[in-house]
Each structure stands twice: as C-alpha cells, then as structure tokens.
C-alpha cells in the first residue's frame, strides 16, 4: 500500500508538478492551497507525510505545521519552499518538521527526501545545509563581539494568525469569520499585537508580519478598509 501524502501549496502549477513527481510511489490524498485547509485535510486523512510551502495564505506554512503536529504528532513534515534563509530553516525545525527542501531542487532530490523522512531521518537540501555550515564557520572565525540586546517579540499563535490575516488585507469582520471568533475579539487581539510590537498602523503591522516571516513581501496586497 502506497504511503498517503498531502501537498500544500497555493500555486496550483507547483502543486500539480509535485504531485506528478510523487504519484508513482505515493497516494496524494489532498492538495490544500492555504494553511487552514491543510489542517483540515490532515485531520480528515491522517496522512503519512505532508509537503508544505511556507508562504501559504490565511495561515502560513510554519504555523499550520505547529497545529498539525499537535493534532497528528505521528505525521512527517517536509517544508518545500523558495526560502533558503537560516531563520526560516531554524524556525521550521523548531516547529518539528523532518525535512527542508528548496523548490529549485531536482525531482530525484525531492523523492530521496521523502524516502529519508519516512524512514525516520532528517533531510535538508544540500544548498541550505552548506549555507548553515558557512554561517557557522564565519561565526567561529569572527572575534567575539559584545552582545547587543535585541527586543524579543513574543506573540501567541493566535496573535500570529491575526497578524498574518491583517497583513493579507482582511477586514476585522473577515478575520473574525476566518478564525471563528467575534469582531470584538479581533479588535482586542489587534490592540494587544500593536502594543507588543510598538506599532499603530496597518502598514506598520504588515511590515512586522513580513519581518516575522508570516507573509512574503511580494504577497502584500492592498489593505482593506
């Protein structure tokens, strides 16, 4: 029996290409196009593996993976993304994923990664792994620096969800409907988020969402008033 797989990507052509690569060896049971649909698909199918893009709408891939790992701890997760930056890689493995593959990889690498992850190993694309090694080597050869304090932003998972939806241009009413709470609750969350981040306007909140990796800069829409 073929292992069951979910492919989560908001770009249909990308998802279809990945499905084509996997279909000979895996049973692709769902191709959700946003983070919330991914969570529902995992709860419905309980697949062996999910391949997840980071830049998913409504709920980004990393936060969706947090939900998925809580509801289905046995699932294996591979991030499939264009983001090779170290902070994305670090956050992905903090979330609990087992693999990190770049979309620039060849089909053979993707198949190898899925097999490695399903047999209990961790897989990172060589380009990403080499980047992490290079950064570690650079850090080890640099003279010690006096650490400079940086502000720590600690948003709850729900606050991150609200911030992403604000940055995607959703109105308070739309956000409330999406996460199934009242508009007053959304107003409360936005006020707390603004206070935590030290910002006041929607544009500033959007910039913070980009900084936190909740949305990609190219995906920032016109805001809804």
PLM feature segments, named:
Residues 40, 62-74:
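Short amphipathic alpha-helix used as the core "switch/output" element in two-component signaling
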Residues 88-94, 98-99, 104-157, 161, ...:
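Short, flexible helix-to-coil linker/hinge segments that flank and couple to helix-turn-helix
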Residues 12-30:
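Two-component/phosphorelay signaling modules centered on CheY-like receiver
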Residues 169-204:
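Recognition helix of helix-turn-helix DNA-binding domains
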Residues 53, 81:
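Active-site residues of response regulator receiver
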Residues 194-225:
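Basic, Lys/Arg-enriched C-terminal extension of HTH/homeodomain DNA-binding domains
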Residues 34, 60-63:
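Acidic catalytic/metal-coordinating carboxylates
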Residues 6, 26-34, 41, 199:
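Short hydrophobic/Thr-rich beta-strand motif most characteristic of the beta2 strand and flanking loop
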